[in-house]
Amino acid sequence: MCYLLTMVLLAGILIVPVFAASDADSASDKKWVIATDTVFKPFEYTDDDGNFVGIDVDVLDAIAKDQGFEYKLKSLGWDASIAACQAGQADGMIAGASITDERKDSGWLFSDGYYNATQSMTVQKDSDIKGFDDLKGKTVGVKTGTQGATYAESLKDEYGFNITYYEDSPTMYQAVLGGQVVACFEDTPIMASSIKDGDLALQ
């Protein structure tokens, strides 16, 4: 049975759903394969030495020590991590995401949260776009399956812009810098970290 240790953000809440294993699969009997998305700094990412680090990684390590199990972390990306869990190719997943009613209704369980997240939009530093009204007729970028995508979708019809979807954040930011899209949406802490650490010419 799959353990799902997914970190989830929404309206000031970051929480961890855990799907319990069957009695036959004691946590201490095996090394669990945990999938993740390591381009979501500061929650999960790789350092200069290629090690998996971040808030979610620290939480997973603490859970493993408390519950007495070993694990192997695999960076698969968000969609692939979910698919691996569903197919039994991974025992669980830990990654930054957002709480939605749809996820609750599908059976995700949530603990108390620890992070307050909001959504932000960024553009090139020399862009004439100052607000949502300036997006009319233009195209923005979002990462597939994120709250940033949901937020942009909620504004799309009102402000008359188009949306292009990307599988990871770095590609999305490069699309803004390269002019393929005029702006992008993402969780504020992820965006701030990406712009600062990558020294990106975005604002």
Language-model region placement:
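Beta->alpha turn/N-cap motifs
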Residues: 36-40, 74-79, 88-101, 125, ...
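Short, low-complexity disordered leader/linker segments with a strong preference
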Residues: 1-31
